[in-house]
Amino acid sequence: ICTSDIHTLWEGAIGERHNMILGHEGCAEVVEVGNMVKDFKPGDRVLIPAITPDWNSLEAQRGFSMHSGGMLAGWKFSNFKDGVFSEYFHVNDADGNLALLPDNINTVDACMLSDMVPTGFHGVELADVQFGDTVLVVGIGPVGLMAVAGANLRGASRIIAVGTRPVCREAAQGYGAEDFVSYKNGSISEQVLAMTDGKGVDKVVIAG
């Protein structure tokens, strides 16, 4: 379950949505394929990403797959059709939108790869984190933790994380965060300036 599912449940979806099953990230077993699908067959275990664009769309081909067909229209599950919480669901452009799961990866672990990991990593890519950068990650829920991991993998020399929950701080430390800021203690920027001798940071990833 993604936090976005909770938001949809309590606050509503983007636009009018009625009688639609939630869920937009997960793993599944293929039960049937269309006649144009070449890379998958019934019985395959697959990873389903949150974004499943139409890859022949102009937006996807220009690098904006999440906006394939319109603003956030690449996010199809539980927005334009039933999501992955249903027993059976349809995946468009299967050859481009599915990934085959190796036998040695269980589905529980693999589910993290469909949205949380790539979202956090993509935030780090968009921030253009470089070797030696000091990076601030705001929010250390699942996506923020993956942003910390991504910044560490790209060679950040120092990672400062904003968050208060002890369990999240412990996990963030395991992924490479060295220092922590609490929004409960006042201005985040002032705390960061104080711990960096007024230098601030090179890159910021917003994940909260």
Where are these regions (language model features)?
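Short N-terminal strand-loop motif that marks the start
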Residues: 1-26, 86-89, 93, 99, ...
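Buried hydrophobic positions in well-ordered alpha/beta secondary-structure cores of metabolic enzymes
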Residues: 5, 28-30, 43, 57, ...
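Glycine-rich beta-strand-centered segment in the early N-terminal region that forms part
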Residues: 10-61, 82, 102-104
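N-terminal Rossmann-like NAD(P) cofactor-binding module of classical short-chain dehydrogenase/reductase
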Residues: 47, 202-205
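Glycine-rich, N-terminal phosphate-binding loop of Rossmann-like dinucleotide-binding domains
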Residues: 50, 184, 208
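NAD(P)H dinucleotide-binding glycine-rich loop of Rossmann-like/cofactor-binding domains
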Residues: 54-138
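Mid-domain Rossmann-like dinucleotide-binding core that forms the NAD(H)/NADP(H) cofactor-binding site
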Residues: 100-186, 190
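A glycine-rich helix->loop->beta "capping" turn
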Residues: 195-203
